[in-house]
Amino acid sequence: YDYCEHYSPXCDSSAPEAAQAQEPPVDEYAPEDIMEYDYEYGEAEYKEAESVTETPTVTEETIAQTEANIVDDFQEYNYGTESYQTEAPRSVSGSNEPNPVEEVFTEEYLTGEDYDSQRKNSEDMLYENKQIDGRDSDLLVDGDLGEYDFYEYKEYEDKPTSPTNEEFGPGVPAETDITETSINGHGAYGEKGQKGEPAVVEPGMLIEGPPGPAGPAGLMGPPGLQGPTGPPGDPGERGPPGRPGLPGADGLPGPPGTMLVLPFRYGGDSSKGPTVSAQEAQAQAILQQARIALRGPPGPMGLTGRPGPVGGPGSSGAKGEMGDPGPQGPRGVQGPPGPTGKPGKRGRPGADGGRGMPGEPGAKGDRGFDGLPGLPGDKGHRGERGPQGPPGPPGEDGIRGEDGEIGPRGLPGEAGPRGLLGPRGTPGPIGQPGIAGVDGPPGPKGNMGPQGEPGPPGQQGNPGPQGLPGPQGPIGPPGEKGPQGKPGLAGLPGADGPPGHPGKEGQSGEKGSLGPPGPQGPIGYPGPRGVKGADGVRGLKGSKGEKGEDGFPGFKGDMGLKGDRGEVGQVGPRGEDGPEGPKGRAGPTGDPGPPGQAGEKGKLGVPGLPGYPGRQGPKGSTGFPGFPGANGEKGARGVAGKPGPRGQRGPTGPRGSRGARGPTGKPGPKGTSGGDGPPGPPGERGPQGPQGPVGFPGPKGPPGPPGKDGLPGHPGQRGETGFQGKTGPPGPGGVVGPQGPTGETGPIGERGHPGPPGPPGEQGLPGAAGKEGAKGDPGPQGVSGKDGPAGLRGFPGERGLPGAQGAPGLKGGEGPQGPPGPVGSPGERGSAGTAGPIGLPGRPGPQGPPGPAGEKGAPGEKGPQGPAGRDGVQGPVGLPGPAGPAGSPGEDGDKGEIGEPGQKGSKGDKE
């Protein structure tokens, strides 16, 4: 077997050569003394289909021809270098023998005859046609052995030490398994070929010579013993498959479809760039990272279907394997050779091999994103408990189901508590100056500022236009009498004196009429949050939105109860033929067949290896042919046959309990940065800033014209009001008055653009699982499923006990060969094989419709405090407050500078 596999690539199969005795002959052969030499001789003549018989006819002419042909046929075979020469004999344990030999030999094994040329008597020595196949080791020879000496190795001392290819050992019939073609009564056994020359064996060497050529056809031999039953023929055509089984019960509903709806705001016409909002990009990034988790776990395995109906009877089974050889029958009359039979048909392919063991578990993957909890499935009916099956191998990932429909929008949750005020944001960059506003109406007069320090004297201004004459001042008191001066020239006008102290503040005038409305002031800070208004009327139903992106898969819902058992489906179409099954184990031994007719003469077998020198015995006298010996003891149990084909698939076991939750996976990769959050609430109002510094004093007015001398007159009437002077520069800002009353609420402005999306909040805790729904009605009968694959073939039954030995039959007359009998009726159906392993998990069923919406979950926990919002837009300026009360009079100012000299007084009265 080894040699065939490793040294002869053209070998068809492991050659089933049986044992050949190569040991020195002893009185008893124990089973371990029978050695096996598995050699592949490489020539087409010696295939395993021939059986070799010994019927020597000695004719002188063929000896020379035998020697000449040997060298030609086997020139390329170099026996000196073959590796099997050094192989030690092994004990017989190969798979080639149907029954290992355990019988005890009752006489010395005949390893060869003396083939010297003196023994050329041409009498026909008829040996029994004994098949030497290792099964029947009682070598009782019916013929006359007296004229044959056992071979003695006398000549090896005289021969040269390097034997040549022309020197061959004694021919021992090669022992091969008797196959069907040589025992079915269609070939007569031929005669034995001529003897070869004696072999030359050096001490300690085994040299194998090539086989000689075939001898001439001998006379017709006597009919052989009943041969053993042949090996089984190729299996017949495969029977039609049985009717398909009933469809299985409905599987559990699939996991709910994805329900994640992400609102996306697409850019309008005026947006720059691609119309992908930051929110959508963020969702895409999240979904890409969660793409692994989008495929839900495969659904649980469906319940086992009911067994299918019993199939019809199959076609006739394959022929059984070779049986044990029957007892030796009486010697039959030599029959004429029959015609050669036709070769049998090729058998059908064997069934599929068994399913392999599941592979090692792969490395643990990263933890997927937590899915949303699934809706609980409807509870089915409880199924009958099946027998515990072996755990099936993990199924392949199912195809991802189609997206479910978008569920109805949930009710709005309750408003959360108001968030804390965020920290004040950093001041933004200084904006560009706005367009100058329209001048507002003059504000109310501010409180009097403190007296500023006198400014430096301004440059002399151009003289102003002549003012209107002022009102006459009051008459001054008479001055002291001055000395009589000469009238002097009119002096140059003096410089302006400093302004006098400001007068006391007059009383406030009446309130003026309402001025035109001023420009809108800056927007005020938003007021506190109002009380939640009453619910408005429910709006009209909106149009159906676009399909949202896939949500994360939900948690696996609780397992529903088993559904009602469906009705029996229609019988499915016939399935395709299954693959070829493996060859079954050997069947029990058949009854011994009738004696076959004598076959044709077989080809000359390969000469065996030369035996060891036997002990020289005295030549015995010719004895009478003995009776057939009794059967030997029952042989030891044979080597286990090849494993039978895999049994039929057993019923599916119950579903295992739910496994423990796996460990939390590593955190996923960091998500992309979220968009800006919505603006936070405005910060608290800051404290009032300090009062600004006092403004600089205005420029000095132009000097008035010099007054004329004269007595002061009586005060005249009040002159007309002068023209209004140009508006002076604005004075310093007054102190901020108290806040005026809130103006009436203006009309609601247009809705602003929506703010940028806030960052995604942390995932809330999963809501409580919904209550279990009520049990649904059984669904309509489903369409019959596709045919499952053919089940695996059951294990073969145990081998039957060997039958009792029949009595030897009487010698029958030679009958003509009968026509072949009709095909036997099919045997009874065998018992069902043991349950096969659990089949592969079925394909995932279609995604069920979305279940009813669960009850509203409890409000989630309060989320973490959001980031501080941006500063709000400045509110509108409030209406101007009412004028404040008049301030207290200011402190007296510093003393003014000395005025210019007055005009000269009028001349006093003369006393």
Swiss-Prot record:
GO cellular component: collagen type XI trimer; collagen-containing extracellular matrix; extracellular region; extracellular space
Compartment(s) where it occurs, according to its Swiss-Prot or TrEMBL record: Secreted, Extracellular space, Extracellular matrix
Post-translational modification comment from the UniProt entry: Prolines at the third position of the tripeptide repeating unit (G-X-Y) are hydroxylated in some or all of the chains. N-glycosylated.
Domain Collagen-like: 209-257, 296-353, 749-807, 806-864, 851-909
Keywords of the record: Collagen, Extracellular matrix, Hydroxylation, Repeat, Secreted
Region of interest (Nonhelical region), residue spans: 1-186
Annotated region described as Triple-helical region (interrupted), given as residue ranges: 187-275
Annotated region (Triple-helical region), positions in chain: 296-911
Compositionally skewed regions (Acidic residues) per UniProt: 104-115
Region of interest (Short nonhelical segment), residue spans: 276-278
Compositionally biased spans, kind Gly residues: 308-317, 350-359
Biased composition annotated in UniProt, kind: Polar residues: 78-98
Residues where Allysine is found: K379
Biased composition (Low complexity): 15-24, 216-228, 408-429, 484-495, 642-670, 685-694, 708-727, 738-748, 799-808, 825-841, 853-877
Keyword field contains Glycosyltransferase: no
Residues that make up the propeptide removed upon maturation: 1-278
Pro residues composition-biased segments: 466-477, 843-852
Main location: secreted
UniProt region (Disordered), positions on chain: 1-31, 73-130, 155-282, 295-911
Family: Belongs to the fibrillar collagen family.
Subunit: Trimers composed of three different chains: alpha 1(XI), alpha 2(XI), and alpha 3(XI). Alpha 3(XI) is a post-translational modification of alpha 1(II). Alpha 1(V) can also be found instead of alpha 3(XI)=1(II).
Functional summary from the UniProt entry: May play an important role in fibrillogenesis by controlling lateral growth of collagen II fibrils.
Protein name: Collagen alpha-1(XI) chain
